[in-house]
Amino acid sequence: MLRLLNGQGTGVLRAGVIGTGAFGRHHASKYAKLAGVKLSAIADPSSEARRAAAAAHGVLAVADWRDLLGKVDLVSVCSPAVTHAAIVRAFLNAGAHVLVEKPIATDVDEADALIALAEANNRILTVGHQERFVFARTGLLDYADAPLSMECWRAGPWTGRGADVSVVLDLMIHDLDLMHQLFPSNVVDVSARGRSTHSRHADEVNATVTFENGSQAKLFVSRIAETRRRGMLAVYPDGAIEIDFVTREVRNSTTRVLHPLTQDDPLGESVAAFVKAVREGGATPIRPEEARRALETALLIEDAAMPVQSRVLEPQALYA
């Protein structure tokens, strides 16, 4: 049963957004359009970002996210990854339900603590692995058999976003989440190599993940590429499935019946599913335990890719 914090008895949920960068702005827009939800406040250390958000939505805009504690029923945490654990923990303790952008945390122990806290406080905790909604549209997850092998590639030009963590935690973690949806077997070996050119962390990584049943997944991710590419290839005993997530093209030589990838709004679906779970008390499509599993594999890949050649840059302002 949902415990409303506003005491109004109207059923209107007060939503907050922490961080109004590229993702945070979209989260705010989604909440503003949902029935039964009031976008109440946003928090961002940038005065320019606060002014823009306040102008766009006519809401309270504060510099310190702590000012929102106890004043919202649910919140999207879209701040830099290194700040996720502290902010999520504070809002769970304040009684709010939380949707945190990936990764759930930057440490497995932190993720475990957040999952336990959400359960102890009877609060919903879910993670923004929106690619899952895109992938689910193909219908491939409806088939129980795992592929023999898998390849994933995700590359794009440098934008400066997500530079507080490696490209593995920033981008590859999407593909790791999809990988674990297709491969139920345990990971037994990880090998990787990476390089850094624009940040303190790996900006490009090649990785191979081997599973207990002998299957393998090969992954490539880059945030310093010249062109944008996103796709996957899954090989089965009766053929192969290749998906281009940029062109929305699906090539299928297997006996599985798949659906075309239509234009969609995965972030909107993610926010709407979160709100529905809060209102109805049900489960979210992305369980925090699944996000924790993707994080664990991501950290194994980070360790395997070290050392990477890195140069020291000026410290960037983080939302702490």
Model-predicted regions and their roles:
Residues 1-57:
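N-terminal Rossmann-like dinucleotide-binding module
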Residues 105-162:
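A contiguous active-site-proximal alpha/beta segment in oxidoreductase catalytic domains
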Residues 173-247, 261, 268-283, 301, ...:
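Contiguous beta-strand/loop segments that form the cofactor/metal-binding neighborhood of enzyme cores
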Residues 27, 57-115:
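Beta-loop-alpha module in the N-terminal Rossmann-like domain of NAD(P)-dependent dehydrogenases
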Residues 63, 100, 125-127, 243:
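Hydrophobic residues in well-ordered beta-strands that form the structural core
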Residues 1-8, 74-77, 123, 212, ...:
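C-terminal helix-rich "cap/oligomerization" subdomain common to oxidoreductases
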Residues 128-135, 158-187, 270, 291:
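Mid-domain beta-loop-alpha active-site segment that forms a flexible
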